[in-house]
């Protein structure tokens, strides 16, 4: 199962968090969900964000405002000189949504350890007609050099302009997709070439997450329920014995 599903969706609530954090009633939920999708596509389409390497857009809704957090490897490009770009982005989003919007920028210090940015980099090189094997080797080596414990990159499409599409994959280190406490990042990007679209998938393993970052209450709850059931069965046996003695 871990090989098929999204590693991020499988680990939500364990060591991953939701990109959108808000509560809504059944009538409002669909409208707010589509609004979140519109905000993300809107931000990525702005000219100020084209070459900013934005990996993720978090949306947090408060009663009075909407907070948008952009995770980027190039915060200077997003902010601009004296904050001109970020003010322009905030004003445009606020105008289209007709709501009070607060824009925040969070820097990604190591872009080689972000699966989405690695996939985007590979897709960019494939669009520039660089050899796909060279792209995969360079991306894999750069990721492992930055401190990752494992990486898997898969490309699929008309590789090298071949008439038949195929899938190629490169692995280095280990990527334990079935282990829920493993910190695995996943990213997907598309390269649009003259021969067609090429899909790029990246799985990146950064190590195990222990302590408060993992949920440990499941085992304790199971042990507690077994203990309680054992105590109840002992009480039933005692009651039967007392009834038998009285009879």
From Swiss-Prot:
Question: What is annotated about its quaternary structure and interactions?
Answer: Part of the 30S ribosomal subunit. Forms a tight complex with proteins S10 and S14.
Assigned protein family: Belongs to the universal ribosomal protein uS3 family.
The protein's superkingdom reads Bacteria
Compositional bias ranges of the Basic and acidic residues kind:
227-247
Any one GO cellular component localisation term in the record: cytosolic small ribosomal subunit
| Stored InterPro entries | KH_dom (IPR004087), KH_dom-like_a/b (IPR015946), KH_dom_type_2 (IPR004044), KH_sf_prok-type (IPR009019), Ribosomal_S3_C_sf (IPR036419), Ribosomal_uS3_bac-typ (IPR005704), Ribosomal_uS3_C (IPR001351), Ribosomal_uS3_CS (IPR018280)
Q: Does the keyword Oxidoreductase apply?
A: no
Organism of provenance:
Treponema pallidum (strain Nichols)
CDD domains, from UniProt? KH-II_30S_S3
Q: Where is this region: Disordered?
A: 224-247
Keyword check for Cell division, yes or no.
no
Q: Name one Pfam family in it.
A: Ribosomal_S3_C
- Put simply, this protein is called Small ribosomal subunit protein uS3
Query: What UniProt keywords are attached to this protein's entry?
Result: Ribonucleoprotein, Ribosomal protein, RNA-binding, rRNA-binding
The free-text function statement in the UniProt record for this protein reads: Binds the lower part of the 30S subunit head. Binds mRNA in the 70S ribosome, positioning it for translation.
Organism classification, top ranks? Bacteria, Pseudomonadati, Spirochaetota, Spirochaetia, Spirochaetales
